[in-house]
């Protein structure tokens, strides 16, 4: 049993959770979407201020939901990388302070590793090896998971992340923020075959294309030109059809690469994580293609696709059981490759008896 309290403040969600191994006992998320909507995106300074205002109440509520006391918490974890530095600092300072006050081990967690572990919360029997398709506003990666802290990056976006592309296309279509849910909703009433959009392949120096890397900047530009074409002609922009065609193209690009990657690496399972994992088009297309290839696919419940502390606590519990601990002077970092997760930890050295 490993009961962990975790704090997640890497971007614009103030989240606190208490998890016992892979079972959620308390989970609180204070969203800032409405606050940042008027700016069309996250303002780092505003995000940090609201983290400061919300975090104590979130901690109290998580304890109320769990019915536990501080004496029952075995470790305290916070997201330490990657993310907005000011936001990360706020969460890390809170977690480290609580660890010192209550004399608990401190565990820093890589945000992307949290997304990998999100599916464990609904599929507690899930075990490596598997391929993780990690798709969010800041990342699009194909990661081979061999164990806790054991990751190999097989492919990634060369420019815009998938979630970032959704936000930018939503802005081009003037349909609101955040772009992911809006595009998904519009796509349900549009024709995904209305417009043929570029998938965004990466050319190799010796010819051919990279099997797993992807690009979404060209797709975004194609949507821009399509919108401009209709506006120049004085015609109404077919927003739903463009949204559906865009979403279909992104889902197809991710699906082709994920299924091929899993097949090439002889992995029988694909785990999807990140905010874009909530997209209904991706869920439908990837599930169908994977089933045809004899591959099992797991998507997190919708509430665990976006940023939350339950996934951070789950990842921390695995590291805690492994004997990993973080120093209280561990710095936060705006960037840290998923392959460098273990740099966050100092192995637990057993105390030696007196000779």
From Swiss-Prot:
Entry function: Required for the formation of a threonylcarbamoyl group on adenosine at position 37 (t(6)A37) in tRNAs that read codons beginning with adenine. Is involved in the transfer of the threonylcarbamoyl moiety of threonylcarbamoyl-AMP (TC-AMP) to the N6 group of A37, together with TsaE and TsaB. TsaD likely plays a direct catalytic role in this reaction.
Record key words, sorted: Acyltransferase, Cytoplasm, Iron, Metal-binding, Transferase, tRNA processing
Protein name, per record: tRNA N6-adenosine threonylcarbamoyltransferase
Catalytic activity field: L-threonylcarbamoyladenylate + adenosine(37) in tRNA = N(6)-L-threonylcarbamoyladenosine(37) in tRNA + AMP + H(+)
Residues involved in substrate binding: 134-138, 167, 180, 184, 279
Localization of this protein: Cytoplasm
Primary gene name: tsaD
EC number: 2.3.1.234
InterPro entries for this protein: ATPase_NBD, Gcp-like_dom, KAE1/TsaD, Peptidase_M22_CS, TsaD
A single GO cellular-component term on record: cytoplasm
Co-factor(s): Fe(2+)
Cofactor annotation remark: Binds 1 Fe(2+) ion per subunit.
Gene Ontology terms describing biological process: tRNA threonylcarbamoyladenosine modification
Example of a GO MF term: N(6)-L-threonylcarbamoyladenine synthase activity
Sequence positions that bind Fe cation: 111, 115, 307
Similarity remark: Belongs to the KAE1 / TsaD family.
Main localisation: cytoplasm
Pfam family, one: TsaD
């Amino acid at each position: 049993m490993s009961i962990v309290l975790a704090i997640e403040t890497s971007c614009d969600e103030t989240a606190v959770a208490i998890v016992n191994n892979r079972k959620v006992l308390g989970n609180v998320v204070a969203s800032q979407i409405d606050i940042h909507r008027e700016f069309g995106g996250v303002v780092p300074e505003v995000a940090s201020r609201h983290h400061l205002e919300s975090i104590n109440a979130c901690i109290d509520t998580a304890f109320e939901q769990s019915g536990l006391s501080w004496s029952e918490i075995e470790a305290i974890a916070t997201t330490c990388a990657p993310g907005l530095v000011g936001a990360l600092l706020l969460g890390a300072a809170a977690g480290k302070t609580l660890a010192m006050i209550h004399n608990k081990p401190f565990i820093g967690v890589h945000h992307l590793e949290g997304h990998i572990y999100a599916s464990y919360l609904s599929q507690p029997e899930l075990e490596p090896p598997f391929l993780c398709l990690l798709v969010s506003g800041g990342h699009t990666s194909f990661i081979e998971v061999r164990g806790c802290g054991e990751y190999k990056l097989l492919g990634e976006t060369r420019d815009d992340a998938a979630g970032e592309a959704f936000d930018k296309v939503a802005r081009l279509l003037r349909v609101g923020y955040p772009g992911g849910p809006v595009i998904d909703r519009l796509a349900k009433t549009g024709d995904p075959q209305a417009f043929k959009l570029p998938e965004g392949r990466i050319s190799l120096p010796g010819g051919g294309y990279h099997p797993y890397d992807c690009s979404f900047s060209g797709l975004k530009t194609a949507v821009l030109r399509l919108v401009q074409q209709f506006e120049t002609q004085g015609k109404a922009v077919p927003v739903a059809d463009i949204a559906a065609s865009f979403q279909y193209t992104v889902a197809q690009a991710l699906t082709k690469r994920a299924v091929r990657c899993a097949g090439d690496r002889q992995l029988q399972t694909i785990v999807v994580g990140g905010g874009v994992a909530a997209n209904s088009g991706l869920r439908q297309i990837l599930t169908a293609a994977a089933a045809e290839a004899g591959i099992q696919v797991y998507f997190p419940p919708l509430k665990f696709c976006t940023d939350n502390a339950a996934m951070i606590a789950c990842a921390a519990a695995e590291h805690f059981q492994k004997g990993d601990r973080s120093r209280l002077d561990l710095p936060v970092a705006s960037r840290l490759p998923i392959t460098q997760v273990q740099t966050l930890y100092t192995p637990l050295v057993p105390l030696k008896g007196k000779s």
